[in-house]
Amino acid sequence: MEPHSQEPDLKPIYHRLLSPLSLFPSKAKPPPEPPKRPSQDATPLQSIPLAKLKVGPLCRQVSKRLASSGRAARVTAKDRLRLTEVILEELKCNWREPPIEPILDYENNQKLRQRLESYVLISSEQLFVRYLHLLVTLPTSRRVFTESATLSRLAVNLARDCTVFLTSPDVYRCLLADFQTLLNLKHAQGGIVKLRPPPCPPGTFKLCPIPWPHSTGLDHMPCSSLNLNYLVQLSRPYDFPSEPEPDPVEELKSIPQLKSRQQLLWVPSMIKDKEIESRPSPMVPLPSHSPSSESHQFPTSPVHSWLQRGQSMPCLHEGWSLADELCLLPPSPHPLTPLILASESKPLPFRDIVAEDLKQKMKIMRMEWSRYSLLDSGLPPLLGVLTRRLTAQHHLEKLQQMIKSLQEEEASGKWDLQPPRIIPLHPQPVTVALKVHDQVIVQVATVQLSERYFNDSFHVEGAGVLYNHLTGELDGKAIEEMDADRLVGNTTGEVYKELMSRVSVSHLSFEEGDQIEPSADKDWSSYLASSFLHQDKHMPIINRNLVGFYSRRTSTPKPVPEKVPSLTLLPRHKSWDKRPNRHGVWMNWLKPSVSSEDYFKYLSFQESDFLHVIFQMYEKEAPVEVPVPVQEYLDIQQPPPLLQDEELEFMQGKWDWSSVIEDGSGPGRAYIHNLQQRLKRLWVMLEVPEQNRLDMVIKYSSNARLQQLPALIKAWEQVLKPIQKRESLLGRLEWFEQQASDPNRFFQKPDLLMNRLLEENRFRSYLQRKLNRMESNLVSLLERIESVFGEPVTFKGRSYLKKMKQDKVEMLYWLQQQRRIRNLTQAQKTFRQSCTFTGSSSQALVAPGNTPTTH
């Protein structure tokens, strides 16, 4: 009864306290809601078709929104346009109009389409601003690609993200699930729903490549990848329904009275934790629709719903703190500060704080170690790490059994190198149920195998790869050679190739022969009678190349000359039919002739293959190479030695008149004349110059050197023939290289070029082989002559031994110079002709393309 009596006394006090608050404006009241239409009006709305969400207007809205986004970013207009085009192209190509949901009414379908439209606009802006941020930061942090390459890479990634976050079927499914969840929650809470802002995805505020703050104007832009849940929650409509304002007096009455006599002590953290756990959570989780894997799904944002009421100050414990924004772990629980400190409370010592901190860390470590399997199973540490308690229990037991068996074998000292054989089970038949006429069930068993089995085990090792053509172990040519035996076409092609090589190249050159056939120089009328066949064998021969051909045919019987009829011996007045010996003459002529039976008998004994005759495939006899008779020339006659008193010092170009041979007559003069003739012949054949001839005359005209002259001439005559043969071969090689070493031959037709190159290589090898065989013996002969007589054998005034080492290279060099001279002459003529037409001769002469230029 006492409180009721005090109420009238407190009202004036309340009004006096609340009167100053009337100076402040009250909360803005929302306009009164229009009265709801009756249920009869809902039927006409269902007949009105929903507005289609077409891609054209949607792209215009997206383009307009992106044009006003990210203006502070320091990027060019071309880059902004490129990113905008990527987003719009993705929408134009892959956009699909959402279907009408039959479970929703007309109004909710319209709201769902508005929600989808807002989602597309927000997601496009988020992607656009994020890639603007990457476009600014990537070139600064990684100077690997150029700006254009970086823009291309970002455009490709943006197109992929647009497919995932804008046009993917998962987007519509996730939006529909979120819309239905909010709709159900709104109906459950009576139309009062308060939505919290969606959390940023984890890692949103990670450190960027450039330290903050950026100069890009994108400091509010997250630096990590987006996810579908975050964008869906970002597109939620934040409409807070209004409720009638409470009476201030009732608010004051609801404040509890403080008990000043009771002291507030420290509130233990465990009590707070229990209160938090026991408190019913009004959050409603949403289904997760993320394109990433299940192990990396981000936590969805809960939906909180509570009744609004007047609060003196916001509740900081249930709000969205900075730690939640940064996705940090919750701090360790500490006791809350009491409103009134007790007198008995004392500050904790430092040692106790450290001890409590260590206990908390040990508790966290035990929680982390409890996730893994304990190594108390008796296994070694390495094996224990590889096992898990739940997923590898069977494997763990097998390892324990194996270790136990190994330990028993080690303790017993008996090692069984071969594993125990498992006796195979007898094969059991397999029965198959079969219905016959839908009445009788017959079980058909398979054939039972034999009970015999092998006691020995068989081990077949698989053959490795012989070669791997992908790594370049075998080239294409080697593979073709390995497969040549399996292809019939290759062998046939080789046969035809060999046959065509026998055909003459000039078999189609009809113009090479005589255009007019010469007339015969014999009387053809005398060869028309049959009596001409038995005349002399050399008489009817017109082609002189066939002389002696009949002499090789020994099998042909020779007719008796007395019985051979002759037109010249017959009387002219008698007729041929009136001859009495007519029958005997014809029989004698028919006997040696060949009949048709003889011809067929001859063919039966011969081969039926005439291809070698058609294509002239005769066995070529190996060319008989006559070896140069150099070995017999090695026996050089030693000249008589010079006496000490007769030996005179020879000086080139100086003639000692006192040593000249005196003129005389007799056999000695004829001998000297013979030596002179032989020496002149050597000079002519070896093309010795005049100065060298004069030196030889001066040297060997003395009495002392005259005795060595016959041996010198004989040695030079022995080496003359090999030198001549080598020079002839060298001349053939020079004539051959004049055409074969011409670089212009490479510009001919390919089919002709290959055959020509093969023939050139074959002929060059043949000449080189003959030269090498000859030079090996010729070098030893020349060296011996030079060592015996003290002077070398010369050719054109040059030591032939030195010439053999250089003449091949010199020949190729001078052939090249001759071709250059011809090309320069031809170019000069062409230049002069062009100058005569143009009337200008001030231009420089340009060397042909195949002529190397020298500086």
UniProtKB/Swiss-Prot annotation:
Top-level taxonomic group: Eukaryota
**Is the Metal-binding keyword given for this protein?**
no
* Chain positions covered by the region annotation Disordered: 23-43, 278-302
Keywords, ordered alphabetically: Coiled coil, Differentiation, Fertilization, Spermatogenesis
Quote the biased-composition stretches of kind Low complexity, using this chain's numbering.
287-296
Q: List the disulfide bonds.
A: none
Provide the tissue specificity: Specifically expressed in testis (at protein level). Not detected in other tissues tested (at protein level). In the testis, localizes to pachytene spermatocytes and spermatids.
Fetch the InterPro entries from UniProt: CCDC87 (IPR037383)
GO BP field: cell differentiation; positive regulation of acrosome reaction; positive regulation of fertilization; single fertilization; spermatogenesis
Indicate the family of this protein.
Answer: Belongs to the CCDC87 family.
Q: What does this protein do?
A: Plays a role in spermatogenesis, where it is important for normal sperm head morphology. Also required for the acrosome reaction and thus normal male fertility.
Q: What is this protein called?
A: Coiled-coil domain-containing protein 87
Tell me the organism. Mus musculus
